[in-house]
């Protein structure tokens, strides 16, 4: 139903603008000027009056739309901008970034005279006042996943790879259920850098200190990561031609930016290439779009890359240069960098999972140094620097004692400051003067089947378990 906008200046009737004034009645005959003179004078008067009237009407016509447009467009534009900024401010507040939310509202010109904006500012200030500092960042848990199974029929088809998938992977259905449980149990994603960071001391030195995480009472921070986000060829390419195909085992084949969003490429059982939420990153993004309060100030997961088969599904390691050719290799590097930039912009952290997926705790210091150098030269040079190392196989270079020795010296010189092993404890964090260590808890088929009690603070395995998973899960 159309309604009349009281702000709109009515337009003139087009017919009114073209109607000439009625001719005046002819005066009675009298002696004086000749009849022809009088007729000429009358016609001249009519012409002059008509011209004046037209000028007046045109002038009013020109002014009315301009005034009408300004009167209508300016408030509308202001309202649209206000609504957009207010929606973003509410999202920031939902993610516990109250200062940015307040700054967004007070950045709107004239906000003091808009009741809705005044109320929003007051609400954000009240929420900030109620937030409490998380008392002990060393009790923050860290959970991790491998590549998610998109098609259980292909992953669990009885081939030699089925056992490994059953042991070390979770399905998309299970991952979504885990997210829902974590959310319902008041966990909130934080970045690993939120646990602790460098702070300049009075003497000019730098020391890592516990971070200040402010959340509503009852909320609990948690770190999430994913290993091997390179999309191994053996999982997606059945004929060895370097391309994903229908003979793959039901996993995404790469991350990419499509229509401005991070998504996955996936080749289904019919050989059709699809794009969508087929692995952790887009699935987590989907969840956070519905539940922004599951993220602390925009934090998402840490994405760990194993370098020898590239990054994010792009074969950018030196071994692929000759195979791909210069042009295709350069394009792969460009695409990988685009994904890395998009991940960071979305709130993800990128980590090294080594170059060759070697057990850093067992190999020699020389071999570790060579592997780290390959990561730095072939992978980091493309996707950007990181200070986070997630040990392959969880194999740490030391026990609970402080780091020292050649291995640590190499990794520290290569820029790593956050080091994560794998541990079954609910949480394990060390904050040292120059670095941070954290234990990660694996969420996978093996842990869910044999040790569900180690996960019961996070979720109920019975409600998460995907019945498409074969049992028993093979023992390790």
Feature names for model-found ranges:
Residues 138-158, 207-208, 216-222, 229-397, ...:
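Metal-dependent polysaccharide deacetylase catalytic core of the NodB/CE4 family, i.e.
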Residues 53-67:
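Hydrophobic single-pass membrane-insertion segments
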Residues 29-46:
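N-terminal Sec-pathway targeting helices
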Residues 63-130:
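N-terminal, intrinsically disordered, polar/charged segments of Gram-positive cell-envelope systems
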Residues 85, 175, 335-336, 404:
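Amphipathic coiled-coil/heptad-repeat helices and related helical stalk/stem segments
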Residues 47-52:
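Alpha-helical transmembrane segments
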Residues 1-33:
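N-terminal targeting leaders characterized by basic, low-complexity, disordered sequences
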Residues 102-105, 110-111, 125-195, 204, ...:
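C-terminal active-site subregion of NodB/CE4 polysaccharide deacetylases
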